[in-house]
């Protein structure tokens, strides 16, 4: 039962998305608060709901991929009607929690996430690998959820840069994962960037990866970071990532882990810096 629920809701992904919300909250507030838990819980449930609706939309596609064929909807263990009810059961409390944490703005952003992820990205994914350009927008919004729940300004340059970092990170993350799982994607008939653009794929991948690393290097320029040691560490992460790009991107598995570790490392550095600045860590 728990395994089926985990597969349906994709708890691991939802947990990482909720942590991104916590990250945005801590950057804005500098300390934990009740709205941090409320917004993270709402973001977690919203991600679960999107996952359920996605699996309803892609049940035939999931059934053709070894990685996803045993999901409850794709395998037929959970009827579509029941899955839709489960998705709504996750969505409604998500909207209530997010409204409590950040008001109407978070509810509207939640609607944007659903519209872009389930309404645009999921249908487009069958036809073009560049659907990710739309799908990366909702993927970059969780830190914004936390930022707004903490009372941060939606139009501040800091959260705009953070959104850009998350957006740029997702393209190499998902393209490298697709290349890692190449045979499964081809078996399901999903378009791959390396197949759609065989002569330009590697150049585009390097461009997106380099753009992400440059965005990391811009973080110390903005008032995100107070501690000199943290500024240096973030700069070193970006410079190292750029210098080692040829080696890292030569292997989809190696590149996939590199972009993920770099994002996690920088997130942790920024949180530690903010907690030190707030006096919570001395």
UniProtKB/Swiss-Prot annotation:
PROSITE patterns xref list: UBIA
Domain of life: Bacteria
Keywords noted in UniProt: Cell inner membrane, Cell membrane, Heme biosynthesis, Membrane, Transferase, Transmembrane, Transmembrane helix
Metabolic or biological pathway, per its Swiss-Prot or TrEMBL entry: Porphyrin-containing compound metabolism; heme O biosynthesis; heme O from protoheme: step 1/1
GO terms for cellular component: plasma membrane
InterPro entries the record matches: Protohaem_IX_farnesylTrfase, UbiA_prenyltransferase, UbiA_prenylTrfase_CS, UbiA_sf
Membrane topology label: Multi-pass membrane protein
A single BP term in Gene Ontology: heme O biosynthetic process
EC number: 2.5.1.141
Record Pfam families: UbiA
Localisation per UniProt entry: Cell inner membrane
UniProt catalytic activity: heme b + (2E,6E)-farnesyl diphosphate + H2O = Fe(II)-heme o + diphosphate
Single GO MF annotation: protoheme IX farnesyltransferase activity
Transmembrane segments: 13-33, 36-56, 74-96, 101-120, 129-149, 156-176, 207-227, 232-252, 261-281
HAMAP family for this protein: CyoE_CtaB
Functional note: Converts heme B (protoheme IX) to heme O by substitution of the vinyl group on carbon 2 of heme B porphyrin ring with a hydroxyethyl farnesyl side group.
Misc. comment: Carbon 2 of the heme B porphyrin ring is defined according to the Fischer nomenclature.
Homology family: Belongs to the UbiA prenyltransferase family. Protoheme IX farnesyltransferase subfamily.
Name under which the protein is recorded: Protoheme IX farnesyltransferase
Organism listed in the record: Oleidesulfovibrio alaskensis (strain ATCC BAA-1058 / DSM 17464 / G20)
